[in-house]
Amino acid sequence: MDEFYSDNFFDGNAPIGWSERDWFDYLKKSEREISKFASVYSVNRLRGKNLDEIATIAGWPIPKAGDEYFEESDAEFSDEPWTLLNHPVYIITRGLMRCLQEHLGRVIAETQISPALVWDISKTIGETSFFMALGANSTDLSEDLLARCNYKMAAVKLNEIMAKLSEIETPASTQGAERMRRINAIVFDLRQLCLNLAEESAAKPNNL
């Protein structure tokens, strides 16, 4: 196992003193934060809180125009390199996608929808995640109009997901019907997040 964490493997661009093992720990920390966000979202959305409130409770407030959020990110990352893996939009998006995939998997098992539709939905979810990540990365590069384009593309993909979800018959069980309701709520939250971030990107002073 030590060979897998070789300190000499592609470490040329690592922060001073960081080894490959440090980076693996960093990756695991990001995954823990994503899982935490998913749990906080699942509990608090049922209590009627909106995504902005939930993100703040989870320690990952949604960035607003002009925020220096990279200096105020979760305390667990405060002394570590700033990368996409500890970007609030990345953590929030991955957390929401995790919730979406969990509920969708259960609904698919209950309703036995066609493999073609399952593939279409899965592919579009992946494309949405891709555009959301590009949007966050573009913001970090100060390419705000590019970020806006990526967030708008993500919103388009979420519209496609909504259309595909409408093809799924309402599950017979009460639990299945509730999962469908939650799936639609998650997609709505993701879409609203994309639209808000696109608007924030357009509102930045250098784009006026």
Report residues per predicted region.
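Amphipathic alpha-helical assembly/interaction segments
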Residues: 1-208
